[in-house]
């Protein structure tokens, strides 16, 4: 019997520093930059847990710089330089920023193509590779590796080092697998009725292979990888894929309760969680997401190998309406999720209508805790 503790709070840090001796993290992906800082969710497995030290509980000195943009993606390479993908408040155009790690002042910027359908497409879910290059798929469907350099004059520049057309625009999820293939998921299908596309580009063969999800299924979060495969959460189901001789192979699929509609504070009609691998032994024997059940969402924990649901528990034990638009912090036997119900966020273009429509109909969630015991 394995015990998985799920703790849910009204506010939650995006990353948790852990005791490296006591807990097991997913194995580092050699095609990605430093664990903890090379991607939005800490590592290829999206566990949001790192051995890096936090600020501590004492007084800290804070340095800030104002921008007319929102910065969801802030990454740091092995050289300590900060690379970020930000979206302008005015027109939602994405930009790459190279930031001074001491002052946070911009050293160089690069404008990216803006997606016509999703603010999450076009580079928001990007990562640093093992050469400190930013890897993204722009809104035109080009897989780019962007490096930075300093000239003799002291000025810095961002440079597109390589470009490969993968043929699929509006990519929202991006992650390398443990053999170096770059996996992606599109926001929606290539036609009005087809599902989103999951695929990968293989640098060894210079080929792109793809798999189309069932009709109507979209992807609104990033994707994750471990030695067992690549996890994708659509607006209807959780999947695990591996590469095959002719392209992506679906190992398993499990549909979850997506509820009657999109909830206020969430980007899509479906799960708000990027799948997270975790576990006490290998660091990836479990997978977790939340569903979109009404009124209470549930934390779901799956066996990575079989795809069987080994545990489910309501998001809050009080019966309060609940919602989540964030990946888990998952490590060992513990899972942490933030409650984001009715948080004011810019409405996603082409998002499904939200229900209930009035934010005040949702209760405030703070300090509630629940625990889950799962057999396995």
Located regions from the model:
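Short loop/turn segments immediately following the C-termini of beta-strands
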Residues: 86-89, 137-140, 148, 186-189, ...
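Beta-propeller blade signature
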Residues: 197-202, 299-306, 352-371
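Conserved beta-propeller blade signature
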Residues: 82-85, 133-137, 181-185, 229-232, ...
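Short, conserved, GDST-rich strand-edge loop motifs in beta-rich repeat architectures
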Residues: 87-88, 188-192, 338-362
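Sequence/structural signature of beta-propeller modules
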Residues: 21-112, 123, 131
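Surface-exposed loop and turn segments in beta-propeller and other repeat-based domains
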Residues: 111-118, 159-166, 215, 251-268, ...
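Repeated scaffold domains used in trafficking and secretory/extracellular systems
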Residues: 67-76, 114-128, 166-175, 216-227, ...
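Asp-box/WD-like beta-propeller blade repeats and closely related beta-sheet repeat scaffolds
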Residues: 117-122, 140-142, 147-179, 185-189, ...
């Amino acid at each position: 019997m394995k015990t998985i503790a799920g703790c849910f709070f009204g506010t939650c840090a995006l990353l948790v520093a852990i005791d490296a001796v006591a807990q097991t993290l997913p194995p580092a992906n050699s095609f990605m930059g430093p664990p903890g800082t090379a991607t939005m969710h800490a590592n290829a497995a999206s566990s949001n847990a790192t051995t890096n030290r936090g600020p501590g509980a004492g007084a800290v000195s804070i340095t800030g710089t104002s921008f007319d943009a929102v910065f969801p993606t802030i990454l740091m390479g092995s050289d300590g330089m900060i690379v970020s993908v930000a979206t302008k408040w005015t027109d939602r155009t994405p930009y790459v920023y190279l930031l001074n790690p001491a002052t946070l002042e911009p050293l160089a910027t690069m404008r990216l193509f803006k997606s016509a359908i999703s603010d999450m497409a076009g580079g928001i879910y990007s990562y640093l590779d093992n050469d400190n290059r930013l890897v993204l798929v722009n809104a035109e469907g080009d897989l780019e590796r962007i490096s930075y350099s300093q000239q003799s004059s002291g000025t810095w520049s961002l440079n597109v080092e390589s470009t490969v057309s993968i043929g699929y625009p509006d990519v929202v999820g991006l992650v390398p697998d443990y053999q170096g293939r770059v996996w992606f998921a599109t926001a929606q299908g290539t036609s009005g009725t087809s599902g989103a596309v999951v695929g990968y580009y293989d640098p060894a063969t210079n080929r792109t292979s793809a798999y189309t999800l069932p009709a109507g299924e979209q992807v609104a979060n990033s994707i994750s990888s471990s030695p067992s495969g690549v996890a994708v959460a659509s607006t209807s189901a959780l999947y695990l894929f591996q590469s095959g001789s002719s392209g992506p192979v679906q190992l398993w699929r499990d549909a979850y309760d997506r509820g009657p509609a999109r909830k206020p504070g969430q980007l899509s009609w479906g799960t708000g969680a990027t799948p997270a691998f975790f576990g006490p032994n290998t660091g990836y024997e479990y997978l977790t997401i939340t569903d979109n059940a009404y009124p209470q969402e549930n934390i779901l924990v799956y066996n990575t190998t079989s795809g069987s649901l080994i545990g489910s528990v309501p998001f809050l034990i009080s019966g309060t309406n609940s919602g989540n638009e964030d990946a888990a912090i998952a490590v060992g036997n513990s899972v942490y999720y933030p409650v984001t119900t009715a948080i004011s966020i810019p409405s996603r273009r082409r998002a499904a209508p939200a229900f209930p429509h009035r934010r005040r109909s949702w209760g405030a969630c703070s300090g509630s805790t629940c625990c889950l015991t799962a057999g396995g």
